[in-house]
Amino acid sequence: MIGHIHSIETCGTVDGPGMRYVVFFKGCPMRCAYCHNPDTWDPTGGEDHTADDLLAQFDSMKEFYKNGGITATGGEPLMQLDFLIELFEKAKAKGIHTCLDTSGVIFHRDNPTLLAKFDHLMEVTDLIMLDIKHINPEEHLKLCKQPNDNILDFAKYIDEKGVDIWIRHVIVKDITLIDHYLDELGYFIGGLKHLKALDVLPYHNMGEIKYEKLGIDYPLKGMEPLTNQDAIYARDIILKGAKRRRQDDAAKTSQQ
């Protein structure tokens, strides 16, 4: 099976635990206003690789990855679901830690064939970094041109399967950096039993030059980048919302 790959980063340090071999998949149906990889949207082009090709390169440098592993990102890796499953299957057979960085956008429980593939994927995935773009359905649709009901359901599904979850959330002034949305996000993720980490990332405009090269208008032109202090502020609100959810769940359990 052939995978369409945009690029490979051999020394990734922000895409999962430890040093990572990071594979950027081609193709993404989301059109997030702050996307910094618009060159990955098109599912065509890039480099063609087999799972064996990628794992051979990983093996040639495996001493670097003793405390890390392989991360599939993009683009949206789930757009090449069959190839992703094959890659992770073969990686797990070699004892390699597998991490999926995804928006979960193609997940739907009501498709039995698709759900069976997701069940298989969960069996060979150690960690999922789920990027929740916006907790509010209407705002998510405006921000990413896709609904979020299936994405939030994917978070619940991952949790049901017992796979470790890291939540990622980008804060943008007047879009996601709004207290009641942050609290709502926290309340939602507070219900995830297998939540292991929360990354709150301040918006930056470093991807704007890629839009210019591709001849695409940058949706957030003029938007000011945020700071680490903004991220700390937002993270605190999210964690308070998560704590409240856990307290509410505990109270309900004690009343049963």
Predicted regions and their residues:
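Active-site beta-strand/loop signature of hydrolases that rely on acidic residues for catalysis
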Residues: 75
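Short glycine-enriched, charge-decorated loop/helix-capping segments at active-site entrances
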Residues: 39-43, 141-147, 215-224
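Auxiliary Fe-S-binding modules of radical SAM enzymes
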Residues: 2-14, 171-256
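Short cysteine/histidine-rich metal-coordination sites, predominantly Zn2+-binding motifs
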Residues: 46-56
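Conserved AdoMet/S-adenosylmethionine-binding subsite of the radical SAM
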Residues: 55, 59-69, 78-201, 206
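N-terminal [4Fe-4S]-dependent radical SAM core
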Residues: 1-24, 29-47, 60-66
